[in-house]
């Protein structure tokens, strides 16, 4: 691994921290429970929306009502996306004349975008009309992200509030996060991307003569798909959505044309999840809590990013055994260039891969299926940790707080004391709910992979033999059950078996985590804060950060090490010359 690669990794995380701290302070103000004041256009729009919808901005919901509102809203969004997909052939905004999306793919896509997964069993530019891309998918990118942040806000209020406090109003949280946080960020990023060359147009396609035109075929031309790309790419990155306008996602030069656009998009993957760590510290009135969680996330992500970059820069061991020179030099980037854009190279591709799988983003600027065995292992494991290393906007942090609850419970067992977190006692109910939320996605991954290995409809969709084929199955279930959305491209994901299986996995991974989190929030909201005593475990500082990291890694290792040994580990050992 070169010094330049290490410097790039250090600069990337330095820029992330510098941007996340002030954004976190702003996000904390957005998530405060005070009614909207002021005469600005956003405040007036917010109050108008509340009046139109009959929402009381001062309402304090219990956890069941908050959950019912979130589920109802998400179900309505799912049905709206499905309807637009099925009717797009008869609707305007379809200059390419694309037909209706097939029922199973439409259902899978609607579930995918409602759950913030953005798993794509279709090619964007060849399947979805402009209206569907804008009115269904881009809108859901905002709303699914806002849902995750709203649930996080409810949990944090329960931890920070007095006994008997409510969780706030889901409708108010959803509106504020969308209008005051996601829309301004996405608008700014979309303008920057358009400046860099990302299209934002209502035109269907451009036609260009090809370089291979001959006297026999002088009219040979290439049809280049266009559309409202910049607006969708901006929110797909900031909202940890990940679904690309084009089938090649951010490897496509119209989604990611320049080194600057690549940096902006990669930083945007982690920006909001990182900022929410600092918002958490501000909301609980102890900034050390936010820094502790953020440090724990970095302590996992940075080494795994280095490991991914190192694996890709070393190249394929099977080719090295044949004498292929894959060393970085002044004339070549070196490493494993299969499946990568020549303008980006293995380092930028590997940094993106680590970031997109740490967050539940899933966008790609390279083909993950073409990574080396070890280069694909670390992004796969980052997803299997539960998408809590930054994770999705809102969902990543509330997932990490579940591990924090589990960590203080384990520490309490070791010293024989009732555990506490932020002054609220952690009892059997909270531990059961946290365990359910942590285990549900993992069980879905393992059971789904087992079913795919046993049924011809499952393993028949695999495009590669041996351990790599098994890794394709494992990656697909790990991605969908943890709401990531990236994929190993060798899997035929649009078959009926896989559209149904991944759709169910996405629903379980989203709502079987969200509902226990809200149940925990309801339990904490009823509890009186307990003053810290001499035996209270401090939940800030290096000691607790280390305990939190150990808990996350222990659960991830015990759950998935056998499966990983059957896939990428064996694949790597097979490639190493004997």
From Swiss-Prot:
Keyword Nucleotide-binding listed? The answer is: no
Which superkingdom does the taxonomy of this entry point to?
Answer: Bacteria
Q: According to Swiss-Prot or TrEMBL, what is its membrane topology?
A: Multi-pass membrane protein
Under InterPro entries, the record lists:
KdpA
Among the Pfam families in the record, one is: KdpA
Please report any disulfide bonds recorded for this protein chain, giving both cysteine positions: none
Q: What is its main location?
A: membrane
Task: Report whether Ion transport shows up as a keyword of the record.
Answer: yes
Where is this protein localized, as stated in its record?
A: Cell inner membrane
Gene Ontology CC annotation, any one:
plasma membrane
Q: Which UniProt keywords apply?
A: Cell inner membrane, Cell membrane, Ion transport, Membrane, Potassium, Potassium transport, Transmembrane, Transmembrane helix, Transport
**Molecular function as annotated in GO:** P-type potassium transmembrane transporter activity; potassium ion binding
Q: Where would you find the membrane-spanning parts of this chain? A: 3-23, 67-87, 95-115, 136-156, 181-201, 264-284, 291-311, 396-416, 436-456, 504-524, 543-563
**Family to which this protein belongs:** Belongs to the KdpA family.
Q: How does it assemble?
A: The system is composed of three essential subunits: KdpA, KdpB and KdpC.
User: NCBIfam families this protein is in?
Assistant: kdpA
Primary role? Part of the high-affinity ATP-driven potassium transport (or Kdp) system, which catalyzes the hydrolysis of ATP coupled with the electrogenic transport of potassium into the cytoplasm. This subunit binds the periplasmic potassium ions and delivers the ions to the membrane domain of KdpB through an intramembrane tunnel.
Q: Which PANTHER family match?
A: POTASSIUM-TRANSPORTING ATPASE A CHAIN, POTASSIUM-TRANSPORTING ATPASE POTASSIUM-BINDING SUBUNIT
What HAMAP family does the entry give?
KdpA
This chain's protein is named Potassium-transporting ATPase potassium-binding subunit
> Which organism was this protein described from?
Anaeromyxobacter dehalogenans (strain 2CP-C)
Gene designation per UniProt? kdpA
